[in-house]
Structures are given as structure tokens and as C-alpha cells.
């Protein structure tokens, strides 16, 4: 089974880079460019994993996460948050949930792979 991953970032270059990399790893990729699209696509497609920028137009990734947690169909989707800001700066808005991780931009593909491999099983994904 191929993992379906939803990327949400308002920077189209970052989205394109992540999409290309994840497709090279045989994942199916969806993209969103703001918080509203993230919420809509997550509810519609129910991906195995969400990779979300913290600050996006429409709604912060962390705010959308809170909305997704209230929906029985999306509450178990693991989320990898990414941001140019440090974890220390964001610790008050990042959820304290074992199904989430955080990477500071620029992210390395090794760190990305590690987080994906940790998070996918937490949402029930079975390869």
C-alpha cells in the first residue's frame, strides 16, 4: 500500500521540492497552499500523514490541527509540522501529541525520512 501524504505550505517552491522527493519514494502526494485547503483536503482525502507549515495564509497549521482533532475521520492523522521558526519559539503553539513531530527549515531529507517512518505507523498505516 502506498502512503498518501498531504503537504501544506504557502511556499510553492518548498511544496514542489517535497512533492518531488516524496514521489521519488513512491508516496502519493497531495498539496495545499493555505490553511483552508489543508483542512478541506485532509477531510476529503484522509491522508496517512500531513506535513504542514506552521504559518500559512487562511489559518496556521497548528490551528487546522486543532480542527482536525475534533473530526473522528481526521483526528488520528499524524502531522509533521515544519517552520523557519525554532521549536523553542513555537513551543507554546505546537501540540503536545505523540502523533506530531517538528522540523525546522531548512529540513534535511534524512530528518524528513526519519519523521515519516516514525509517524506513519502511529496513524495506522501499514505498508
Model-derived features with residue positions:
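Acidic catalytic/metal-coordinating carboxylates
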Residues: 34, 60-66
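The feature encodes the CheY-like receiver
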Residues: 15, 57, 87
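Active-site residues of response regulator receiver
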Residues: 53, 83
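C-terminal output helix
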Residues: 107-116, 124
Amino acid at each position: 500500500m502506498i502512503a498518501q501524504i498531504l503537504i501544506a505550505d504557502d511556499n510553492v517552491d518548498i511544496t514542489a521540492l517535497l512533492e518531488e522527493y516524496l514521489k521519488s519514494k513512491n508516496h502519493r502526494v497531495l498539496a495545499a497552499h493555505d490553511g483552508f485547503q489543508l483542512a478541506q483536503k485532509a477531510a476529503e482525502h484522509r491522508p496517512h500523514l500531513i506535513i504542514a507549515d506552521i504559518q500559512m495564509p487562511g489559518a496556521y497549521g497548528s490551528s487546522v490541527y486543532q480542527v482536525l482533532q475534533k473530526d473522528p475521520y481526521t483526528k488520528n492523522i499524524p502531522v509533521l509540522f515544519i517552520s523557519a521558526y525554532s521549536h523553542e519559539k513555537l513551543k507554546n503553539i505546537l501540540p503536545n501529541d505523540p502523533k506530531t513531530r517538528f522540523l525546522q527549515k531548512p529540513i534535511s531529507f534524512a530528518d524528513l525520512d526519519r519523521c515519516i517512518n516514525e509517524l506513519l505507523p502511529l496513524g495506522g498505516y501499514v505498508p
